[in-house]
Amino acid sequence: VTCFCRRRGCASRERLIGYCRFGNTIYGLCCRR
C-alpha cells in the first residue's frame, strides 16, 4: 500500500483514508492499493 498526502484530492486509483496536517494546512491522506 502506497500513501501520499495530497492537497487537492486523490488520484483516480487512490482512496482518501485520513488526513495529514502540516502547520495550518490540512492534506488528504490518499492510499493506493
From Swiss-Prot:
- State which residue ranges cross the membrane: none
The record ties this protein, via PROSITE patterns, to: DEFENSIN (PS00269)
Q: Where in the cell is it found?
A: Secreted
Q: Which Pfam families match?
A: Defensin_1
InterPro entries associated with the record: Alpha-defensin_C, Beta/alpha-defensin_C
Task: List the disulfide bonds in this chain.
Answer: C3-C31, C5-C20, C10-C30
UniProt entry keywords in alphabetical sequence: Antibiotic, Antimicrobial, Defensin, Disulfide bond, Fungicide, Secreted
User: Where is it found, in Gene Ontology cellular component terms?
Assistant: extracellular region
Q: What is its main location?
A: secreted
Please name the GO terms of the biological process aspect recorded for this protein, alphabetically. Answer: defense response to bacterium; defense response to fungus; killing of cells of another organism
What is this protein's function per UniProt?
Anti-fungal and bactericidal activity, greater against Gram-positive bacteria.
> What family name appears in the similarity comment?
Belongs to the alpha-defensin family.
Q: What is this protein called?
A: Neutrophil defensin 3
Q: Which organism was this protein described from?
A: Mesocricetus auratus (Golden hamster)
